[in-house]
């Protein structure tokens, strides 16, 4: 049932990698909690930096955090001042040495998390949900996505009865494991309650070259 499972979890270990790359035995629950705390803190602290994902790698006595952002200048700051400040804050939070890498997202229009957050932000500002979704779909297709599906659920437009509305363009093959599907969710807080936003973006197929390296045909 490709439509009903999380497309990222469905492809983990096949075409997708884990967001946390480390191994632990007894301390695993504490480290998982620490990972969740780091992500929550970064999301709140860099609210205006278009954060798509945070990957965490652990080495003995050190945590390496990679921030995937559409606006690297906001994260790094003038002469790297912001990133140094952030490194100190995270070191204080974890009690360990922290390294921060910043990776720029070249095409934010085809990054599911940024698209979902953008739609949610527009819904919070009372912009028509149809206009917000259509605009996101058109931008993604224009920037090279092979397919996109967007859904919003809740009291859309302040309606008495909650419902789900969606738009789709191109193809989004959820059953195909080699399909490079980017999936994300976001929540819009409105005066009528919360509205959930889901975005699926099909970027191409993951194929292997003669050297055994994998790449997406959509890049």
Swiss-Prot record:
Keywords from the UniProt entry: Ribonucleoprotein, Ribosomal protein, RNA-binding, rRNA-binding
Domain KH type-2: 38-106
Signal peptide (UniProt feature, chain positions): none
A Gene Ontology term for the protein's cellular component: cytosolic small ribosomal subunit
GO molecular function: mRNA binding; rRNA binding; structural constituent of ribosome
Subunit structure: Part of the 30S ribosomal subunit. Forms a tight complex with proteins S10 and S14.
PANTHER family on file: 30S/40S RIBOSOMAL PROTEIN S3 (PTHR11760), SMALL RIBOSOMAL SUBUNIT PROTEIN US3C (PTHR11760:SF19)
Name this polypeptide is given: Small ribosomal subunit protein uS3
Organism: Gemmatimonas aurantiaca (strain DSM 14586 / JCM 11422 / NBRC 100505 / T-27)
Lineage: Bacteria, Pseudomonadati, Gemmatimonadota, Gemmatimonadia, Gemmatimonadales
Encoding gene per record: rpsC
């Amino acid at each position: 049932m490709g439509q009903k499972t999380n497309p990222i979890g469905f492809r983990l270990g096949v075409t997708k990698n884990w967001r946390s790359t480390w191994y632990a035995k007894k301390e695993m629950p504490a480290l998982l909690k620490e990972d969740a705390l780091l992500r929550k803190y970064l999301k709140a602290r860099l609210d205006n930096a278009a954060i798509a994902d945070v990957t965490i790698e652990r080495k003995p006595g050190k945590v390496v955090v990679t921030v995937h952002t559409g606006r690297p200048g906001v994260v790094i700051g003038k002469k790297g001042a912001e990133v140094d400040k952030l490194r100190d804050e995270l070191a204080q939070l974890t009690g360990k040495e922290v390294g921060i890498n910043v990776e720029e997202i070249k095409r934010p229009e085809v990054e599911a998390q940024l698209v979902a957050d953008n739609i949610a932000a527009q819904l919070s500002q009372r912009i028509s949900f149809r206009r917000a979704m259509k605009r996101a779909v058109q931008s993604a297709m224009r920037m090279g996505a092979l397919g996109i599906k967007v859904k919003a659920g809740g009291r859309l437009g302040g309606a008495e009865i909650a419902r789900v509305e969606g738009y789709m363009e191109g193809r989004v093959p959820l059953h195909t494991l080699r399909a490079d599907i980017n999936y994300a969710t976001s929540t819009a807080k409105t005066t009528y309650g919360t509205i959930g936003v889901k975005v699926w973006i099909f970027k191409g197929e993951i194929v292997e070259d003669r050297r055994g390296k994998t790449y997406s045909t959509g890049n």
